[in-house]
């Protein structure tokens, strides 16, 4: 993507963009969460952009940041044979406006981000789990989710039914912190 394109976008909507990064012909715009939807409308409808296809929406979890979830929107302009990445950051409480009115395919991607990370999309037409079970607790791609999960789901052949049991840990003398595995454990508390 050329430098003139980036400059023209920055001149047209400077208040919506936090900053942008260009690396190896890939452009990423970081936008404020409240301006995400208008910015995507702009990129879709403006004659010089024509990003009519939402290829993917995903997220990444950075627990050390105040706005720990980075939502990533990958867009394609068939008209100009160009791709662009839009990122916005939110915390656990802040909701994002659903972009399903802008891109209908976003409905599926937003459901996946909700299911895996717990990022809530306001005004989504059908925000429910898509990859995990209906009774599933938590969001498995968060960094504070335990690797083994909270329950074990298995089929018991002798009882001919699905059994849900609490996870049993086979290792002895190991400290499992269910509160926040990303905090440092005090060495003295392990010796007790």
From Swiss-Prot:
Keywords: Electron transport, Membrane, Mitochondrion, Mitochondrion inner membrane, NAD, Oxidoreductase, Respiratory chain, Translocase, Transport, Ubiquinone. It is found in: Mitochondrion inner membrane. Gene3D superfamilies: NADH:ubiquinone oxidoreductase, 30kDa subunit. It comes from the Eukaryota. GO terms for cellular component: mitochondrial inner membrane. It is an enzyme of class 7 (translocase). PANTHER family: NADH DEHYDROGENASE [UBIQUINONE] IRON-SULFUR PROTEIN 3, MITOCHONDRIAL, NADH DEHYDROGENASE UBIQUINONE IRON-SULFUR PROTEIN 3. Complex I is composed of about 30 different subunits. It catalyses: a ubiquinone + NADH + 5 H(+)(in) = a ubiquinol + NAD(+) + 4 H(+)(out). Belongs to the complex I 30 kDa subunit family. Pfam families: Complex1_30kDa (PF00329). Its main location: mitochondrion. GO terms for molecular function: NADH dehydrogenase (ubiquinone) activity. The keyword Electron transport applies. Its EC number is 7.1.1.2. This is NADH-ubiquinone oxidoreductase subunit 9. It comes from Prototheca wickerhamii. Core subunit of the mitochondrial membrane respiratory chain NADH dehydrogenase (Complex I) that is believed to belong to the minimal assembly required for catalysis. Complex I functions in the transfer of electrons from NADH to the respiratory chain. The immediate electron acceptor for the enzyme is believed to be ubiquinone.
